[in-house]
Amino acid sequence: MGKGQSKIKNGGSGKPAKAGKPKKGNKNDETTPTSTPTPTPTPTQQNLDNSAQQQQQQQQTTTAAVSLDNKEQQQQQNIPAPATQTPITQTGTPTIEESQKNTDNNNINGASNEASSSPDSPNGSGNGNDDEDEGPEEVIFSKNKQSATKDDFELLNVIGKGSFGKVMQVKKKGEDKIFAMKVLRKDAIIARKQVNHTKSEKTILQCISHPFIVNLHYAFQTKDKLYMVLDFVNGGELFFHLKREGRFSEPRVKIYAAEIVSALDHLHKQDIVYRDLKPENILLDSEGHICITDFGLSKKIETTDGTFTFCGTPEYLAPEVLNGHGHGCAVDWWSLGTLLYEMLTGLPPFYSQNVSTMYQKILNGELKIPTYISPEAKSLLEGLLTREVDKRLGTKGGGEVKQHPWFKNIDWEKLDRKEVEVHFKPKVKSGTDISQIDPVFTQERPMDSLVETSALGDAMGKDTSFEGFTYVADSILKD
């Protein structure tokens, strides 16, 4: 489930067309080229073009009204900001109708638009469907008496919508605790063959605990829906703030980057690759600290060969993903480099409105770093955006990223305790404030709508697909 920006797993360049030439930072800023290694082999131009054309056709028909409104406001204000970013993954092409639904997303509090698929990766290599062919997933059954049901929560506001359902701000009855409840339709998940992705997201979230990763508190189900109760984080998407401000100062980016590095390092130590790092999937809490959400594309790496699924968001795809090579946690460090560049300049480093051109730039393009970026930050970007996986910064573990000179003043223990001073604090009045969430969603009446009986046949017939989905966090059991 996503955000007010397009989140179609098989479509779009990820950025709507802009009027005039896209800007990176201030128009008068000079750039200095920095060479990066050229990978071999590369995908054929024909396959890249085919994949890009499919995505561009999807994007032209699926840009949400809210995204268009945001883009028009950006153009009127002459702000150089990134636009809609579109994840892609290879497991079944969504129809135009499904794609349109995907544009009605708001990535709030871990709301993921679970991976759909596309029939062709750029070079046609890899099975592209590793998450669906692995056989039954081990499920963990809840053995406590404190499992929740939907009747335990009061619905307050709609804070996001997607192709599989919606996300609502809720209050636990009899308590003052506020959560975000993600509601997913089983029939939609089964129809799009996303059962394993959905179960994997829940399993990963219940196994991790980190100050900069959204927490899962409850998971339960009815005969037609799945429910995940997560932290309610109300400081707004990083995307929202970046769009409004154009780019961030380097000291501000450094704190965000350090918190992301800490979270990625934690995931990688458990052999979990995130695979969808981008501004839309990063929320700010009320104090200005980051919170990574949406684990719909995350995967636990079980073999040394890595995974071959062609998935992610075009602007942030690592070269090895485009090449169809097996990939692992190193793809997250490439995406981090892309994200840092975007926060510092306003656009991703290899961005193009033409997807095929963008893919070729990712594979072979020159990395141009503006002169206003410090030498230490430039060095970090060059290390993270190294095309040769074995030479990429972070490949040997998050520790080598933490030891980079740009982070020399970061006290990592204080950082994880959220004791490091942030440079921006969102304007929210309380923990229940929804002012940073798109009113397109918050104006909708909160209700858990019924699923038509005719749509339930397949889902009800496969109800065992979600066996073991129930979960209650240890922190709840200790209360």
From Swiss-Prot:
UniProt-listed Pfam families: Pkinase, Pkinase_C
Low complexity: bias regions: 52-65, 79-96
Domain of life according to the entry: Eukaryota
Signal peptide: none
Chain residues that bind ATP: 159-167, 182
Membrane topology: Lipid-anchor
Name of the protein in question: Protein kinase 2
Organism expressing this protein natively: Dictyostelium discoideum (Social amoeba)
Gene: pkgB
